[in-house]
UniProtKB/Swiss-Prot annotation:
It is found in: Membrane. The keyword NADP does not apply. Coiled coil: none annotated. Disulfide bonds: none annotated. The chain crosses the membrane at residues 11-30. The gene is ppdC. GO terms for cellular component: membrane. This is Prepilin peptidase-dependent protein C.
């Protein structure tokens, strides 16, 4: 064997252990970030669903609510305008409230 091959060495045990610890810390941090990101996306999706169904329920002719959703719709009329208030509760327990005023076009 040549002298240069005899002098070459691999990584020492402390270097390998340090690299493994760093890798585990990075993977753990990334998995926590991914979990947080997924939870925030799920929350955003629930909020969008709540908004969309609330908007549909405040129409003059509301469509039937999705299964497992609780809807409380109240409609009042005054001075030719119709006010529709809706309280929604999603199957996941998220609650929302919306009020919309419908007035006819006067020309």
């Amino acid at each position: 064997m040549s002298a240069s091959l005899k002098n070459q060495q691999g990584f020492s045990l402390p270097e390998v252990m340090l690299a493994m610890v760093l890798m585990v810390m990075i993977v753990t941090a990334l998995s926590g970030f991914q979990r947080t990101l997924m939870n925030s996306l799920a929350s955003r999706n629930q909020y969008q669903q709540l908004w969309r169904h609330g908007w549909q329920q405040t129409q003059l002719r509301a469509i039937s609510p999705p299964a497992n959703w609780q809807v409380n719709r109240m409609q009042t009329s005054q001075a030719g305008c119709v006010s529709i208030s809706v309280t929604l509760v999603s199957p996941g327990g998220r609650e929302g409230e919306m009020t919309r005023l419908h007035c006819p076009n006067r020309q």
